[in-house]
């Protein structure tokens, strides 16, 4: 059983919802990522999504694109991201870590380091799941099986526009949780319509038996609390990155802890 599945089972037993913060690895400073991850856990994060910097992130809005550009300028790529996870695992062996990114860096990693090397290296580093935005579920059965053999999960996005066929395809290969993108468009865009999310989640659950996390557009504790009434997990990314942009090194971790503690308190209320 994966760390992600174990975490969600424990939360369900306790009647609690998962808090999943997202941060782009290597943003805003290259060396701060492991400390930031530990701070997130201290504040009540249940799973951490770590964005892999990429030069052409088609699903990301301006905030996360800018963070990715900064991380790349800081010299951070997939090799360094795995190093951050290894460092995090020296002190924390329980909190799941999901890498979120695109196919290109993964495929380049295997070209440079050897066929299927990325999965082996990610498992060895302590990664628990992958969310590869541009991997189509209908072509991922072998890859998903390869991950499951290493107790890793393959996570997929669903959107307001997702068809029944898409949901069924995702249900066949996904494990850990699915990530419902609550807005049309890119990350960080628009205002969240909680009623629309409430209407969509039962449709998803007709086809998907694993937990459903909701993200894109969750910017404060009140919205997170409203979404948590219908979702199994709340994902917050762009708001954290906006908050940290331009802040000095010494404020990065305390600001993140303070913000996430407020969200955690709202989820547990």
UniProtKB/Swiss-Prot annotation:
GO CC entries: cytosol
A single MF term (Gene Ontology): tryptophan synthase activity
Active-site residue numbers: 49 (proton acceptor), 60 (proton acceptor)
Cysteine pairings via disulfide bonds: none
Keyword terms: Amino-acid biosynthesis, Aromatic amino acid biosynthesis, Lyase, Tryptophan biosynthesis
Pfam families in UniProt: Trp_syntA
Pathway assignment: Amino-acid biosynthesis; L-tryptophan biosynthesis; L-tryptophan from chorismate: step 5/5
CDD domains on file: Tryptophan_synthase_alpha (cd04724)
SUPFAM superfamilies, per the entry: Ribulose-phoshate binding barrel (SSF51366)
Catalyses which reaction(s): (1S,2R)-1-C-(indol-3-yl)glycerol 3-phosphate + L-serine = D-glyceraldehyde 3-phosphate + L-tryptophan + H2O
Enzyme Commission identifier(s): 4.2.1.20
Function: The alpha subunit is responsible for the aldol cleavage of indoleglycerol phosphate to indole and glyceraldehyde 3-phosphate.
HAMAP family given in the database record: Trp_synth_alpha (MF_00131)
Family affiliation: Belongs to the TrpA family.
Subunit description: Tetramer of two alpha and two beta chains.
Protein name as annotated: Tryptophan synthase alpha chain
Provenance organism: Delftia acidovorans (strain DSM 14801 / SPH-1)
Gene designation: trpA
């Amino acid at each position: 059983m994966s760390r992600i599945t174990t975490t969600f089972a424990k939360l369900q037993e306790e009647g609690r919802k998962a808090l999943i913060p997202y941060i782009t690895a290597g943003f805003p400073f290259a060396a701060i990522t492991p400390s930031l991850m530990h701070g997130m856990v201290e504040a009540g994060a249940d799973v951490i999504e770590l964005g892999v910097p990429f030069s052409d992130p088609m699903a990301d809005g301006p905030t996360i694109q800018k963070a990715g550009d900064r991380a790349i300028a800081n010299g951070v790529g997939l090799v360094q991201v795995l190093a951050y996870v290894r460092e995090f695992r020296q002190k924390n062996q329980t909190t799941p870590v999901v890498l979120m990114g695109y196919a290109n860096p993964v495929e380049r990693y295997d070209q440079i380091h050897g066929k299927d090397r990325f999965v082996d290296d990610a498992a060895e580093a302590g990664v628990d799941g992958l969310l590869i935005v541009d991997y189509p579920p209908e072509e991922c059965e072998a890859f998903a099986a390869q991950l499951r053999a290493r107790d890793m999960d393959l996570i997929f996005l669903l959107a307001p526009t997702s068809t029944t066929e898409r949901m069924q395809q995702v249900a066949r290969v996904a494990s850990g949780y699915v990530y419902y993108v609550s807005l049309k468009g890119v990350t960080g865009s628009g205002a969240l319509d909680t009623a629309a999310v409430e209407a969509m989640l039962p449709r998803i659950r007709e086809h998907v038996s694993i937990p459903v996390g909701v993200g894109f557009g969750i910017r404060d504790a009140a919205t997170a609390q409203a979404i948590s009434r219908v979702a199994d997990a709340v994902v917050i990314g762009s708001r954290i990155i906006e908050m940290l942009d331009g802040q000095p090194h010494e404020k990065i971790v305390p600001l993140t802890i303070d913000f996430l503690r407020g969200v955690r308190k709202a989820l547990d209320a």
